[in-house]
Amino acid sequence: RRNRRVLFSQAQVYELERRFKQQKYLSAPEREHLASMIHLTPTQVKIWFQNHRYKMKRQAKDKAAQQQLQQDSGGGGGGGGAGCPQQQQAQQQSPRRVAVPVLVKDGKPCPA
């Protein structure tokens, strides 16, 4: 018997995000004060902060992996970059999809 998912108002999310930018972790009294200001329970605020910290950590990890992939896949070379803007745009739209070269298929090395 779980509680239903509650969608926060834009004003509540704005206030949560504004406070998160100032401070990634809240003490219990700070959490209670913020919760009463935006009409949420302290538990809702606590969980939102936990989820948001995880989301930021995951986004940073994905961004670092994407930058590493771009560096590894020939960031140099200079000319002939006609397809690059489209490729970069596609990568920005789906940051968690990563191209992985096939090195071994059916136990046999693939030609490079």
From Swiss-Prot:
It holds the Pfam family Homeodomain. Residues 84-93 have a biased composition (Low complexity). The keyword Zinc does not apply. Residues 59-100 are annotated as: Disordered. Keywords: Activator, DNA-binding, Homeobox, Nucleus, Phosphoprotein, Transcription, Transcription regulation. The keyword Ubl conjugation does not apply. GO terms for molecular function: DNA-binding transcription factor activity, RNA polymerase II-specific; RNA polymerase II cis-regulatory region sequence-specific DNA binding. It comes from the Eukaryota. Its main location: nucleus. PROSITE patterns: HOMEOBOX_1 (PS00027), HOMEOBOX_2 (PS50071). One of its GO terms (biological process) is positive regulation of DNA-templated transcription. Residues 1-60 bind DNA. GO terms for cellular component: nucleoplasm. It is found in: Nucleus. InterPro entries: HD, HD_metazoa, Homeobox_CS, Homeobox_NK-like, Homeodomain-like_sf. Phosphorylated on serine residues. Residues 73-83 have a biased composition (Gly residues). Transcription factor that binds and activates the promoter of thyroid specific genes such as thyroglobulin, thyroperoxidase, and thyrotropin receptor. Crucial in the maintenance of the thyroid differentiation phenotype. May play a role in lung development and surfactant homeostasis. Belongs to the NK-2 homeobox family. This is Thyroid transcription factor 1. The lineage of its organism: Eukaryota, Metazoa, Chordata, Craniata, Vertebrata. The gene is TITF1.
